[in-house]
UniProtKB/Swiss-Prot annotation:
It comes from Equine herpesvirus 1 (strain HVS25A). Residues 96-118, 505-516 have a biased composition (Low complexity). Gene3D superfamilies: 1.20.5.1890, 2.30.29.100, 2.30.30.1230, 6.10.250.3280. A proteolytic cleavage by host furin generates two subunits that remain linked by disulfide bonds. This is Envelope glycoprotein B. Residues 794-847, 823-843 are annotated as: Hydrophobic membrane proximal region. GO terms for cellular component: host cell endosome membrane; host cell Golgi membrane; host cell plasma membrane; membrane; viral envelope; virion membrane. It comes from the Viruses. InterPro entries: Glycoprot_B_PH1, Glycoprot_B_PH2, Glycoprot_B_PH2_sf, Glycoprotein_B_ecto_C, Herpes_Glycoprot_B. Belongs to the herpesviridae glycoprotein B family. Envelope glycoprotein that forms spikes at the surface of virion envelope. Essential for the initial attachment to heparan sulfate moieties of the host cell surface proteoglycans. Involved in fusion of viral and cellular membranes leading to virus entry into the host cell. Following initial binding to its host receptors, membrane fusion is mediated by the fusion machinery composed at least of gB and the heterodimer gH/gL. May be involved in the fusion between the virion envelope and the outer nuclear membrane during virion egress. Glycans are attached at residues 165, 275, 380, 423, 497, 514-515, 560, 727, 749, 952, 971.
Length: 980
């Protein structure tokens, strides 16, 4: 904005000084006029007047004439300008973008304007200032030295490659043992084939065939198979609670040699007594013929058992429901066994026979025998902890690096490009079942690798450590140190006067060989004291304490064994997660190493730039310290330190004046002058005149001046915008978007790769993969055998026949008496067996609920029969003729009467009485004969002579009694009469 009105007459007089100080005429007259636009006529005239007044007259006229010229110019000026008193509001804005009036907004309260003096010109100048719309302004008091700072000395840049703890060593990785425990077993059984053949006149056909497998008794295995290499042709087996016998070719029992069959299976051996099946056909046609074949078979097969080893399967398809580690020893009795105890037998020091070479084994073994309903199985018993192991060796790693990172161990194996993660705590092998083999195999493998590769270059720095990695992998790790590093440790020990053997220090296992390890003392390590005469009381106390310690230790061990919960280690079927972990760790280490190098270079660069900062602070301490502290401060160098004061934020209003010219005609302000208040709502007396500094800093003094120059152009930051001055006169506000930004920053956007841990994930579990098939052969076989055992021959279902046991005992007794005794025993046992069978059958029939119902029906039927018998007897007594000869009915009687010419109405008065009497005599005679026969039978049954004599006497009496029987005539007299 122009600071004065240009004179019409174009006078060129000098300065005018008033009481208010050296104020240029154009600055005094400018606020009197209305705010003209830049380049307007009034503004140009005011500028000309100011220039005339500022230029001295060449003729050197006196000052009085200059005063008159000034008065005349003012009169002309007031004639062309609209003179205003102290305005209450700034001039309204115009449409011109460069007008100074666009920077005055709203109505200004007169109480907020500065009122140091009642000079209306000064009030007008302040009122015409530019109010800052937004932005923060600060005022900084001069530093006095109460607060001093210094520049930080150069830093030591870190070396990131030494920030992690690495340990090298040898490792053996174990996985879950999913393979079954395999062992050799012998199967003994007799194959029975019973055929039934029908022989016709010209053909023969097979009508029935029965096939069964029966076990060979353990006694026969001892006495024949493993003793002579033979087998009996007799088969004795129990089916349906009945002992059956079968003989080969239906002949007497003989001993047959065991021979190799013509067909041999791979991985198995077998021996049998015959290759043929007997089928007997007789010479007589139209009959059934039955024949029996008994083939004794011994097979050497492979047996398998999986954890928890409660059963095992044979390659023949049979499943034995007992643990292969079951035995009669203390530790083996706790194993599973589903069979009755009499079916199991264990023999110590057994020497089996090789059926091919007919030679017995040299080394005795402990042999187990189990007799199932169909086969007898034998195998060599071994201890479970020695043979079975739930973990198996997977990889031997000759170079492994262990890295401790964020509370976990990372085992990196470059040979297989895998990284395994585990906890920092060691895994206890006792917490998993059957892991005794791990320590032995790990030690052997690690020692073998060490002797081959590292014995001359490295030493062990610890014992074997076990860690359970994610995915179910057990890592047996033994750390090592190079000889050079070990020498450094040795030198450090010597320097610190610690004379220890390096081998014993780095390898604790060496102490075990020398027996120099100091053991922890306990009451168990103290030998049992022997009482003496001098210290009887002390020895008794030691004896009691030692006994308590032994009991406490035994109790603790037993409680630990029973309370310990063993958990099987499950291993994933793939290590892709470990390979991904290795790849990610490799990328992470490479990228982080690269970024660490950049950070190291950055730190080195900062140390070098620190020297530049130290020199620049001597030139502009406030700017350097403010940039360093990221805070507005005023600074001043005090020797080798810097005095600072913190800048205060201005809460009041800040007004920017529109001219940068000072009272001196040759001197101008290098920064725009401002008027401001420290706090809000301050009165006119609280206004302060100052000068705008860099970055919205307000100086409380106006000391920044420079000689006035032509064609001067300046941009100053005022709030959040910029103001443009031309020839020390405000022109307009400039938004920051109109000024192109040149960035001095070099972007360094570094982000370290975060740690990621890959977990093993299984899309399909092992159980799902096993269940994908249509049929499960193992389950089908198990169900079939369990079905047969459950409903037919399992021990818990079949009741023991005590009578059969007694009979077998009696038969054995008679058999021991020789051939005669055996014959007598057969006769006696036959009769006794018949009686026992009858009684047992009746008892079984009565115990059956259907038998009870049948007996009830029989009782009812007996009562009905008794009723009819009683009725029949009574009928005989009342009318014996009708009862004995029911054919003499009324119809026959009527027919007889009709034949004699009588009517039905006629009575029976003409009936022949003589014939009736004869009939009665005949009936009486028949009754007597019947009674006589009964008496004779009783006498014969009792074998009594009196009865026989009485019977004979009765016969004689009957013979002589009564007339003799005369034959009746062929023709009836009545019929003859009718015929006549």
């Amino acid at each position: 904005m122009s600071s004065g009105c240009r004179s019409v007459g174009g006078s060129t007089w000098g300065n005018w000084r008033g009481d208010g100080g050296d104020l240029r005429q154009r600055r005094v007259l400018s606020p009197v006029c209305s705010a003209p636009a830049a380049g307007s006529w009034i503004g140009s005239q005011l500028g000309n007047v100011g220039n005339l007044l500022a230029t001295p007259h060449p003729l050197g006229k006196p000052a009085s004439s200059r005063v008159g010229t000034i008065v005349l110019a003012c009169l002309l000026l007031f004639g062309s300008c609209v003179v205003r008193a102290v305005p209450t509001t700034p001039s309204p804005p115009t449409s011109t973008p460069t007008s100074m009036s666009t920077h005055s907004h709203g109505t200004v309260d007169p109480t907020l304007l500065p009122t140091e003096t009642p000079d209306p010109l000064r009030l007008a100048v302040r009122e015409s200032g530019i109010l800052a719309e937004d932005g923060d302004f600060y005022t900084c008091p001069p530093p006095t030295g109460s607060t001093v700072v210094r520049i930080e000395p150069p830093r030591t840049c870190p070396k990131f490659d030494l920030g992690r703890n690495f340990t090298e060593g040898i490792a053996v990785i174990f996985k879950e043992n999913i393979a079954p425990y395999k062992f050799r077993a012998n199967v003994y059984y007799k194959d029975i084939v019973v055929t039934r053949v029908w022989k016709g006149y010209s053909h023969t056909s097979l009508s029935d065939r029965y096939n069964d497998r029966v076990p060979v008794s353990v006694e026969e295995i001892f006495g024949l198979i493993d003793s002579k290499g033979k087998c009996s042709s007799k088969a004795e087996y129990l089916r349906d609670n009945i002992m059956h016998h079968a003989y080969h070719d239906d002949e007497d029992e003989v001993e047959l040699d065991l021979c190799r069959p013509s067909l041999q299976l791979r991985g198995a051996r077998a021996w049998q007594t015959t290759n043929d099946t007997t089928s007997y056909v007789g010479w007589m046609p139209w009959r059934h013929y039955t024949s029996t074949s008994v083939n004794c078979i011994v097979e050497e097969v492979e047996a398998r058992s999986v954890y928890p080893y409660d059963s095992f399967a044979l390659s023949t398809g049979d499943i034995v429901y007992a643990s292969p580690f079951y035995g009669l020893r203390a530790a083996a009795r706790i194993e599973h066994n589903s069979y009755a105890q009499e079916r199991f037998r264990q023999v110590e020091g057994y020497r089996p026979r090789d059926l091919d070479s007919k030679l017995q084994a040299e080394e005795p073994v402990t042999k187990n025998f189990i007799t199932t309903p169909h086969v007898t199985v034998s195998w060599n018993w071994t201890e479970k902890k020695v043979e079975a192991c739930t973990l198996t060796k997977w990889k031997e790693v000759d170079e492994l690096v262990r890295d401790e990172f964020r509370g976990s161990y990372r085992f990196t194996i470059r040979s297989i490009s895998s990284t395994f993660i585990s906890n920092t705590t060691q895994f206890k092998l006792e917490s998993a079942p059957l892991t005794e083999c791990v320590s032995k195999e790990a030690k052997e493998a690690i020692d073998s690798i060490y002797k081959k590769q590292y014995e001359s270059t490295h030493v062990f720095s610890g014992d074997v450590e076990y860690y359970l990695a994610r995915g179910g992998f057990l890592i047996a790790f033994r750390p090592m140190l190079s000889n050079e590093l070990a020498r450094l440790y040795l030198n450090e020990l010597v320097r610190s006067n610690r004379t220890y053997d390096l081998k014993n220090l780095l390898n604790p296992n060496a102490n075990n060989n020398n027996n120099t390890t100091r053991r922890r003392r306990s009451l168990l390590s103290v030998p049992e004291p022997q009482p003496t005469q001098d210290g009887v009381h002390r020895e008794q106390i030691l004896h009691r304490l030692h006994k308590r310690a032994v009991e406490a230790t035994a109790g603790t061990d037993s409680s630990n064994v029973t309370a310990k919960q063993l958990e099987l280690i499950k291993t994933t079927s793939s290590i892709e997660f470990a390979m991904l972990q290795f790849a990610y760790d490799h990328i992470q280490s490479h990228v982080n190493e690269m970024l660490s190098r950049i950070a190291t270079a950055w730190c080195t660069l900062q140390n070098k730039e620190r020297t530049l900062w130290n020199e620049m602070v001597k030139i502009n301490p406030s700017a350097i310290v403010s940039a360093t502290l990221d805070e507005r401060v005023a600074a001043r160098v005090l020797g080798d330190v810097i005095a600072i004061t913190h800048c205060a934020k201005i809460e009041g209003n800040v007004y920017l004046q529109n001219s940068m010219r000072s009272m001196d005609s040759n001197t101008c302000y290098s920064r725009p002058p401002v008027t401001f208040t420290i706090t809000k709502n301050a009165n006119n007396r609280g206004s302060i005149e100052g000068q705008l500094g860099e970055e919205n800093e307000i100086f409380t003094e106006r000391k920044l001046i420079e000689p006035c120059a032509l064609n001067q152009k300046r941009y100053f930051k005022f709030g959040k915008e910029y103001v443009y001055y031309e020839n020390y006169t405000f022109v307009r506000k400039v938004p920051p978007t109109e000024i192109e930004v040149i960035s001095t920053y070099v972007e360094l956007n570094l982000t370290l790769l975060e740690d990621r841990e890959f977990l093993p994930l299984e899309v399909y579990t092992r159980a799902e993969l096993e269940d994908t098939g249509l049929l499960d052969y193992s389950e089908i076989q198990r169900r079939n055998q369990l079905h047969a055992l459950r409903f037919y021959d399992i021990d818990s279902v079949v009741n023991v026949d005590n009578t059969a046991v007694i009979m077998q005992g009696i038969a054995s007794f008679f058999k021991g008496l020789g051939k005669v005794g055996e014959a007598v025993g057969t006769l006696v046992l036959g009769a006794a067996g018949a009686v026992v069978s009858t009684v047992s059958g009746i008892a079984s029939f009565l115990n059956n609920p259907f038998g009870g119902l049948a007996i009830g029906l029989l009782v009812i039927a007996g009562l009905v029969a008794a009723f009819f018998a009683y009725r029949y007897v009574m009928q005989i007594r009342s009318n014996p003729m009708k009862a004995l000869y029911p054919i003499t009915t009324k119809a026959l009687k009527n027919k007889a009467k009709t034949s004699y010419g009588q009517n039905e109405e006629d009575d029976g008065s003409d009936f022949d009485e003589a014939k009736l009497e004869e009939a009665r005599e005949m009936i009486k005679y028949m009754s007597m004969v019947s009674a006589l026969e009964k008496q004779e039978k009783k006498a014969i049954k009792k074998n009594s002579g009196v009865g026989l004599i009485a019977s004979n006497v009765s016969k004689l009496a009957l013979r002589r009694r009564g007339p003799k029987y005369t034959r009746l005539q062929q023709n009836d007299t009545m019929e003859n009469e009718k015929m006549v």
